[in-house]
C-alpha cells in the first residue's frame, strides 16, 4: 500500500492484534480491505460485543432506552444517550434490540423539520423548531444512525434534507450556535469541527 511508504514502520500487525477487537474490526476492513461479511471481520465484531467497554455501556442503558436522563440526550457529556450511541457506533458495535431501543428514544428529540435538539419537545411549538445552528449534534446522530442501518427510515431522510438544506455555500460550511456568542471560540462563522463531523457522517452513505 502506497501510504505505508511514508511511515517509519508498518503498524498493520499491531493494529490487527486480538487484544483490541474494535481496532481489529476496523483495521481488517479499512486496511486489509476485507468485506463486512468476511469471517475475520465478523469474529472481531463478535469479540467486540462481549468486550468490557461495550458491556459497560450497554448495561448502563435504562429499560426505556435512554442513558442517564430521559429528558436530556446530551448531558452529562460522554454518558448520556447520544454520546453512548456514538461511542458504540465508533467502536463498531452491531445493531441489536438494545441499540434499537436507544435509537427510538433519540428519535423522540427530532423536530418536525428533521433536526435534533438536546431536550425533549414538550409542545407543538417546540417540535416545530427549525433552529439551524447545531450541525455537530445532527452530524453525530446521523453518523450512528447510519452505522446502525437506519438510512432508509423516513425520519433519517428528513434529517439528511435538513443538513443539506442549511449548508451555506457562501460561508462554505455549517453555522455553529457558539458563534457569535463567543467569537473567540469559533472562527470563522462556520464551525470547522461541526463541518468535519458532518462530512464524516455523510461519508458513511454509499
Regions found by a protein language model. Give the residues of each.
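Preference for long, amphipathic alpha-helical scaffolds in soluble/luminal domains
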Residues: 1-206
Amino acid at each position: 500500500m502506497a501510504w505505508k511508504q511514508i511511515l517509519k514502520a508498518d503498524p498493520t500487525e499491531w493494529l490487527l492484534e486480538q487484544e483490541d477487537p474494535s481496532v481489529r474490526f476496523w483495521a481488517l476492513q479499512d486496511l486489509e480491505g476485507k468485506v463486512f461479511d468476511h469471517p475475520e471481520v465478523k469474529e472481531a465484531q463478535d469479540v467486540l460485543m462481549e468486550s468490557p467497554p461495550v458491556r459497560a455501556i450497554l448495561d448502563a442503558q435504562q429499560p426505556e432506552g435512554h442513558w442517564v436522563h430521559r429528558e436530556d440526550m446530551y448531558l452529562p457529556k460522554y454518558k448520556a444517550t447520544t454520546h453512548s450511541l456514538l461511542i458504540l457506533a465508533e467502536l463498531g458495535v452491531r445493531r441489536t434490540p438494545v441499540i434499537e431501543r436507544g435509537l427510538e428514544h433519540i428519535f423522540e428529540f427530532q423536530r418536525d423539520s428533521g433536526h435534533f435538539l438536546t431536550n425533549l419537545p414538550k409542545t407543538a411549538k417546540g417540535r416545530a423548531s427549525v433552529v439551524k445552528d447545531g450541525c455537530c449534534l445532527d452530524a453525530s446522530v446521523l453518523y450512528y444512525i447510519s452505522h446502525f442501518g437506519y438510512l432508509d427510515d423516513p425520519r433519517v431522510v428528513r434529517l439528511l434534507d435538513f443538513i443539506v438544506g442549511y449548508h451555506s455555500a457562501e460561508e462554505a460550511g455549517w453555522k455553529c450556535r457558539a458563534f457569535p456568542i463567543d467569537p473567540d471560540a469559533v472562527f470563522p462563522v462556520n464551525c470547522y469541527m461541526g463541518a468535519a463531523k458532518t462530512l464524516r457522517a455523510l461519508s458513511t452513505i454509499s
